[in-house]
Amino acid sequence: MATPITLAFAVLPILSLLVSPISCHGNPRPMSLRNYTTTSRYTTSSVPAKSAAGWSSGGATWYGSPYGAGSDGGACGYQGTVSQRPFSSMIAAGGPSLFKNGNGCGACYQIKCTGNKACSGRPVTVTITDSCPGGLCLAEAAHFDMSGTAFGAMASRGMADRLRAAGILKIQYKRVPCNYNGMGISFKVAAGSNPFYLAVLIQYQNGDGDLAAVHVMEPGGVWTPMQHSWGATWRANSNTGKPLRAPFSVRLTSGAGKVLVVRNAIPAGWRAGRTYRSTVNYYAT
């Protein structure tokens, strides 16, 4: 988790079908620790004001290295992938209205600033990968604590350091579809998973980006709902006292209710700590 400031994994055989998320009950929720310093403060109304173009008003700060990816992973559990493609450090920690107790993980937003002379006015796209639970993130209806890279990307050419020096910005933002350019959804079987318990971190969903529900099915079985564990991790337990049987098929339901079914997503012989990348994904629009 995070407080605003101013300022691989081994991929098992590529599956022809998606995988299914299930998550570890006992894993602690990761925290991103940040120092908080500002030169000025401002407040916004409790309800974001929307413009005619569909933009809403909010606030932004940044954290971590000026040219980095914020925290090393964040409260969604994406770990070092936040600095790698396709995220490429263009990420943000969301205040409560954006992080949504982890249900907002993976959602994409365009953000632009216009109230500072260093602002370019051009929108940048970020993915929610972390939580910002205090400070301005609580005081504002919508607040993005952005990576130094993403914050600086809102600046005019050669003005990134000047914009980061401002520390706090009024911004405009809107939700947009995620587009990972042909990448399939990946599923990382979490540490602690065993024959009776399966936990999976799910990422790189096109379109809505977030997930509202996940179901898993054993061979010849029925769809069983999985529980949201934390961040982008979902979990399932054996309800029969017998080991769970792979391969597992997975049914994903996005935040907007779009369903994607992946047959035989996680293979027999799966191992905790391994990532299985499918070759399918939601449409990006």
Residue positions per predicted region:
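Folded extracytoplasmic luminal domains of secretory or organellar precursors
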Residues: 2-285
